């Protein structure tokens, strides 16, 4: 599906807003009686190798869209009406077994026009599951299920545990989007099966999962396995997901991709998030809440072992960055700031939003982690994307294999002995009480952890900030203990060259007297304001 990103994500983001809330049908509509879903056709032999061959054959044929014209009542649903449609607990897949997991399906309508075929896999045999209007309670939607087509199909699905049928721990809905939660039980950023031409000058392509194969778990299984068949105008693919629910939810993913055409920018393991306003960027800070973001930084563990933190921004125009690497060890969008007082939102709880860490299972070779930051005026638009882009462009006839793990939760599963950044603040530079002779911008970067706590309590210890900038000059540079956080604060002013508004890339870390690094590397990209704005200060 080809669309401009803002139009597509405006709809998909809205549809995820209420995820993670209790399902009202888990209460009054829950019964002990289980109604088995109707099956379609004959069962057929199934495994991942079969799915890969199916995807390869799909890529060899011309693409055709599966988007359909829905009945008018479904097309005209408001968000509140669509959200009131709930899948009945007594129709949940595997509710009639002793499996630890259950599946509930999403209805088509509103923004979701492409039916996704659903299959159950039992003992290596797959059989399609039939849509049944009676499996849904239509709430306040005004819909009459008896008047809907019997072959309408499903939009997606969510996963629950038998112990908690009211809350889902993962959901797959819209194009190739999916989300999951850790112990915080809060949805936030999302992942996708694939990104195509994200951040390019033309329309972005949003591949669709056109079919899912749900493998029935055994009674003692703590992992649920499912498969996805992906298709789009330029590429097809087969995916295997092994999902283990826990304090940090783990998705072990294998993907096999088959291009139909040469792709300019392929994004592997894309993460999608939202950043409107934060400590370092208050350009859109007119809201009463101090901070509004799902994540506050991109975290990288490079192939050569460097730990990098790049705070996110809400730029005035689309901004694209690439971080060249060879066999990256991991990357992800993190929500490091976990203090409710910094957000003050008791409705969506941004401090509980999950981090998402991508860990390659094998060498991915040369390429780059790419970061796209898009301007947004409000929190309903996901404007942050990160993904891995292989150096070589994919061509028709190739098979591209990528295996990786996704970790959803409060913190990534990796940690360093180095100190890490906990806050980046910016504001007007200069010396308080003295008239400014020129414009400068102040940065205050806080580091904690590692050896800093011990060093902060010792007098006459030299900790040196190492600061590099691509242009401009730095002044009033300091690094001093900040006992309130048991760490260090680095402060410096950046003075842009003349009236240039060209971006300035900043690189910073702390080292000891022996030249050994004490902190991760902090990266930032600052856009100096135009000359007229500088004169205002």
From Swiss-Prot:
It comes from the Bacteria. Predicted to be exported by the Tat system. The position of the signal peptide cleavage has not been experimentally proven. GO terms for biological process: beta-glucan biosynthetic process. Keywords: Periplasm, Signal. InterPro entries: Gal_mutarotase_sf_dom, GH-type_carb-bd, Glucan_biosyn_MdoD, Glucan_biosyn_MdoG/MdoD, Glucan_biosyn_MdoG_C, Ig-like_fold, Ig_E-set. It is found in: Periplasm. One of its GO terms (cellular component) is outer membrane-bounded periplasmic space. One of its GO terms (molecular function) is carbohydrate binding. Pathway: Glycan metabolism; osmoregulated periplasmic glucan (OPG) biosynthesis. The keyword Translocase does not apply. SUPFAM superfamilies: E set domains, Galactose mutarotase-like. Gene3D superfamilies: 2.70.98.10, Immunoglobulins. Residues 1-36 form the signal peptide. Probably involved in the control of the structural glucose backbone of osmoregulated periplasmic glucans (OPGs). Belongs to the OpgD/OpgG family. This is Glucans biosynthesis protein D.
């Amino acid at each position: 599906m080809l669309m401009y990103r803002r139009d597509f994500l405006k709809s998909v983001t809205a549809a995820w807003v209420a995820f993670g809330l209790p399902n009202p049908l888990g209460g009054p509509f829950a019964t002990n009686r289980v109604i088995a879903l109707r099956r379609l056709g004959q069962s057929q032999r199934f495994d991942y190798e079969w799915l890969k061959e199916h995807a390869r054959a799909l890529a060899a044929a011309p693409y055709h869209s599966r988007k359909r014209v829905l009945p008018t009542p479904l097309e005209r649903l408001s968000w509140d009406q669509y959200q009131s449609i709930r899948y009945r607990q007594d129709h949940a897949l595997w509710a009639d077994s002793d499996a630890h997991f259950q599946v509930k399906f999403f209805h088509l309508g509103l923004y979701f026009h492409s039916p996704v075929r659903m299959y159950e896999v039992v003992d290596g045999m797959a059989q399609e599951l039939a849509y049944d209007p009676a499996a849904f309670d239509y709430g306040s939607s005004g819909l009459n299920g008896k008047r809907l087509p019997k072959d309408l199909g499903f939009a997606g699905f969510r996963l629950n545990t038998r112990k908690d049928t009211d809350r889902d721990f993962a959901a797959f809905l819209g194009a190739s989007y999916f989300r999951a939660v850790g112990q915080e039980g809060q949805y936030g950023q999302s992942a996708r099966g694939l990104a195509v031409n994200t951040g390019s000058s033309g329309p972005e392509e949003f591949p669709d999962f056109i079919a899912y194969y749900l493998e029935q778990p055994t009674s003692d299984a703590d992992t649920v396995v499912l498969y996805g068949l992906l298709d789009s105008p330029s590429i097809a693919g087969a995916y295997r997901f092994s999902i283990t629910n826990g304090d940090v939810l783990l998705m072990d993913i294998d993907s096999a991709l088959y291009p139909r055409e040469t792709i300019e920018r392929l994004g592997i393991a894309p993460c999608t998030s939202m950043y409107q306003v934060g400590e370092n960027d208050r350009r859109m800070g007119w809201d009463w809440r101090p901070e509004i973001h799902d994540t506050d930084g991109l975290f990288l563990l490079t192939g050569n072992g460097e730990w990098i933190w790049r705070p996110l921004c809400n730029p005035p125009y689309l901004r694209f960055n690439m971080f060249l690497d060879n066999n990256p060890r991991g990357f992800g969008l993190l929500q490091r700031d976990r203090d409710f007082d910094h957000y003050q939102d008791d409705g969506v709880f941004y401090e509980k939003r999950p981090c998402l860490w991508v860990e390659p299972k094998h060498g991915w070779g040369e390429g780059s982690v790419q970061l796209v930051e898009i301007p947004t005026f409000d929190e309903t638009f996901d404007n942050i994307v990160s993904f891995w882009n292989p150096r070589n462009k994919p061509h028709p006839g190739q098979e591209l294999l990528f295996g990786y793990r996704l970790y959803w939760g409060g913190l990534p599963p990796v940690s360093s002995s180095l100190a890490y950044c906990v806050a980046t603040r910016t504001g007007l530079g200069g010396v308080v009480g003295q008239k400014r002779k020129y414009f400068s911008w102040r940065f205050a970067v806080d580091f904690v952890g590692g050896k800093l706590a011990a060093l902060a309590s010792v007098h006459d210890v030299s900790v040196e900030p190492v600061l590099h900038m691509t242009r401009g000059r730095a002044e009033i540079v300091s690094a001093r203990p900040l006992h309130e956080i048991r760490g260090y604060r680095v402060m410096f002013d950046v003075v842009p060259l003349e009236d240039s508004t060209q971006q300035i890339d900043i690189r910073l870390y702390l080292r000891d007297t022996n030249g050994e690094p004490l902190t991760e590397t902090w990266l930032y990209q600052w856009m100096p304001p135009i000359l007229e704005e500088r004169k205002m200060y």
